[in-house]
């Protein structure tokens, strides 16, 4: 179980690294066409369709205005000023980022991966982002969710604030875990496994 958990952690890190690379490439493309709404949308659609790594993809300018978004049902938000912890974090930090979980403008619990858009003069123009809807199907939760053990054990993922990012019981995703001996020990554990009875 320990070896398998370590392998899943490595696969997850690789997935996030690859997703950030896709966004970095797109940020370079989008930086050359910010004034062309059609070209922006085509590239935003391409990133979503390319690998199915994200549930949605988008471009936000330096003022927080949504310039393009995919899939199509979210396009009614284009032109609006986006206000959320994830947007604020990306606009403030202006670097490659995996956000803390937050509720999006479309009312989804999400984690956003983002890459800044920087022009040739080094000016920050905004960012390209991709979201993982934590309560809906995506590649990451498919990977984690397909692995139950015959003995009834399972895995779950928590962030540094004790919020469940993945759990086999989808209703628990987004909740904060209290009174859990394993999670209480996490800050003191370098790595490894802990036997715990649920």
Report each predicted region and the residues it spans.
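Solvent-exposed, extracytoplasmic
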Residues: 36-53, 73, 83, 123, ...
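Extracytoplasmic/periplasmic ligand-binding sensor regions of membrane-associated signaling proteins
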Residues: 50-53, 57, 62-133, 137-139, ...
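Extracytoplasmic/secreted envelope proteins and their assembly/folding machinery
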Residues: 2, 20, 24, 41-45, ...
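Juxtamembrane extracytoplasmic/periplasmic/luminal helical "stalk" adjacent to the first N-terminal
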Residues: 1-38, 46-53
């Amino acid at each position: 179980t320990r070896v398998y958990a370590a392998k899943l952690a490595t696969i997850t890190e690789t997935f996030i690294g690859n997703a950030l690379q896709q966004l970095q490439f797109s940020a370079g493309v989008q930086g050359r066409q910010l004034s062309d709404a059609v070209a922006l949308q085509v590239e935003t659609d391409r990133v979503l369709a390319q690998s199915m790594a994200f549930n949605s993809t988008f471009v936000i300018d330096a003022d927080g205005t949504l310039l393009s978004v995919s899939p199509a049902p979210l396009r009614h938000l284009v032109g609006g000023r986006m206000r959320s912890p994830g947007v604020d974090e990306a606009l403030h930090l202006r670097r490659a980022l995996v956000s803390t979980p937050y509720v999006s403008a479309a009312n989804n619990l999400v984690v956003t991966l983002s890459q800044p858009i920087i022009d040739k003069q080094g000016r920050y123009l905004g960012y390209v982002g991709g979201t993982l809807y934590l309560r809906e199907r995506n590649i990451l939760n498919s990977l984690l969710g397909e692995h139950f053990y015959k003995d009834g054990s399972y895995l779950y993922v928590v962030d540094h604030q004790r919020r469940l990012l993945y759990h086999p019981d989808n209703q628990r995703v987004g909740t904060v875990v209290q009174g859990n001996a394993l999670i209480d020990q996490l800050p003191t554990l370098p790595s490894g496994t802990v036997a715990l009875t649920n």
